[in-house]
């Protein structure tokens, strides 16, 4: 039996775009096959985010994430998804030089991972690249507001779009990406009123992460909402579980039983005549 999921009913970028103004789009990150299966059962988009650099690899930011890392985890997620639309982040340095560089790397991501779309950060200055990719068969999700790959120029992980000038700039960025052909735009860490405004102004779904309730959908880093990543906790994260604490308690119990020679017990060992 093949381990590859049957994808006949898999959502695509066109399906996500058609959800504008309708049922909210549910998106979570996924980086591994087991987590992808869980996300696939309940979500519309499985985002292979470059946040994996921080969450899984212990990097201080997303800037050190490579194409090879994104491909490795993209393949793993694709093995676990049969319904959700798989979107893979383009890592820092893989698309900023121009449309041709972006196409080479986006095409590689799609060919090697089996994803349905790529996501890239940036506003009006990326519109030409988005249009170039879309015209050549590569669906693109945009990302404006707080763009983590630009954290060094933004002065940290701060709320963006406060003040009329900044709000107008970010709204124009989102509109430019939508006009260039992006099928959806992520809005990160914006005042709620700005998230609402952009959602009303552009023709494609907005996916909010710290941008308010009025966005067309929401996304969170799955390790954040499950309580598995505790290095920091953004205000916009709601913890739906505390799996990090549960895992810590389970590992502590295992260690105690091993040291006390209580594990393995009789039910966990093999002997003559015992079933395997």
From Swiss-Prot:
UniProt binding sites for Mg(2+): 50, 89, 121
Location in the cell: Cytoplasm
Keyword Metal-binding carried by entry: yes
Pathway(s) annotated for this protein in UniProt: Cofactor biosynthesis; (R)-pantothenate biosynthesis; (R)-pantoate from 3-methyl-2-oxobutanoate: step 1/2
UniProt keyword Magnesium present: yes
Necessary cofactors: Mg(2+)
SUPFAM superfamilies according to UniProt: Phosphoenolpyruvate/pyruvate domain (SSF51621)
Active-site residues per Swiss-Prot or TrEMBL entry: 188 (proton acceptor)
EC top class named in words: transferase
Any GO BP annotation: pantothenate biosynthetic process
Catalytic activity: 3-methyl-2-oxobutanoate + (6R)-5,10-methylene-5,6,7,8-tetrahydrofolate + H2O = 2-dehydropantoate + (6S)-5,6,7,8-tetrahydrofolate
Keyword terms of this UniProt record: Cytoplasm, Magnesium, Metal-binding, Pantothenate biosynthesis, Transferase
A GO term from the CC aspect: cytoplasm
UniProt-recorded Gene Ontology molecular function terms: 3-methyl-2-oxobutanoate hydroxymethyltransferase activity; magnesium ion binding
Lineage: superkingdom: Bacteria
EC number assigned by the record: 2.1.2.11
Binding annotation for 3-methyl-2-oxobutanoate: 50-51, 89, 119
Cofactor binding annotation: Binds 1 Mg(2+) ion per subunit.
Family: Belongs to the PanB family.
Complex and partners: Homodecamer; pentamer of dimers.
Cited function: Catalyzes the reversible reaction in which hydroxymethyl group from 5,10-methylenetetrahydrofolate is transferred onto alpha-ketoisovalerate to form ketopantoate.
Protein name, per record: 3-methyl-2-oxobutanoate hydroxymethyltransferase
Biological source species: Paracoccus denitrificans (strain Pd 1222)
Lineage start: Bacteria, Pseudomonadati, Pseudomonadota, Alphaproteobacteria, Rhodobacterales
Gene name, Swiss-Prot/TrEMBL: panB
